[in-house]
Amino acid sequence: MELHATTIFAVQHDGKAAMAGDGQVTLGESVVMKHTAKKVRRLFHDKVIAGFAGSVADAFTLFEKFEAKLNEYNGNLERAAVELAQQWRSDSVLRKLEAMLIVMDKDTLLLVSGTGEVIEPDDGILAIGSGGNYALAAGRALKRHNGGQMEAKDIARHALEIASEICVFTNDHITVEEL
């Protein structure tokens, strides 16, 4: 059985960038193993935030590989993401990893997947994981209708809170990082 399930949400808003993730780790489809996992982390001298959804062991492998790429390309987020995606897609061992990453710095927000995709959203919002669609919808509504009164970190936190009320694989122990 694998450990997985989570929700990660990221937003760029009013010159700031924030990412939030819940703390639930689920064994299979029915057992919560941990409530306080930290799936959002700062990398590269605290200039980059990365969050993962999927298999925990696979995600840690990808974090290490991504951080190595960031160091290799001196913090160039886009180049590091593209290089990781290429390696992930072409390496027979990495190709079996079951996880997705959202990575961001102050200027750029990207989704990185094992199929070789590196996607930058049109609206500055991304969400992945079991509650990703709920968080995405909530985040878009918050940004669109309350954006003038909320900071990026507040949009991220509230989007995750709403997702946790709907998705059984997402809890309300939320970690938020902001740039």
Swiss-Prot record:
Top EC class for this record: hydrolase
Any one Gene Ontology BP term: proteolysis involved in protein catabolic process
Subcellular location: Cytoplasm
Coiled coil listed as a keyword: no
Active-site residues (renumbered): 6
Regulation of protein activity: Allosterically activated by HslU binding.
EC number per UniProt: 3.4.25.2
Record-linked InterPro entries: ATP-dep_Prtase_HsIV_su, Ntn_hydrolases_N, Proteasome_sua/b, Proteasome_suB-type
Keyword terms, alphabetized: Allosteric enzyme, Cytoplasm, Hydrolase, Metal-binding, Protease, Sodium, Threonine protease
Record-level Gene Ontology MF annotations: metal ion binding; threonine-type endopeptidase activity
Keyword Transferase part of the UniProt annotation: no
Catalyzed reactions per annotation: ATP-dependent cleavage of peptide bonds with broad specificity
Pfam family, one: Proteasome
Annotated residues for binding of Na(+): 164, 167, 170
Signal peptide region: none
GO CC annotations, alphabetized: HslUV protease complex; proteasome core complex
HAMAP family from the UniProt entry: HslV
Function: Protease subunit of a proteasome-like degradation complex believed to be a general protein degrading machinery.
Known partners and oligomeric status: A double ring-shaped homohexamer of HslV is capped on each side by a ring-shaped HslU homohexamer. The assembly of the HslU/HslV complex is dependent on binding of ATP.
Family statement: Belongs to the peptidase T1B family. HslV subfamily.
Protein name, entry field: ATP-dependent protease subunit HslV
Originating species: Listeria innocua serovar 6a (strain ATCC BAA-680 / CLIP 11262)
Gene field: hslV
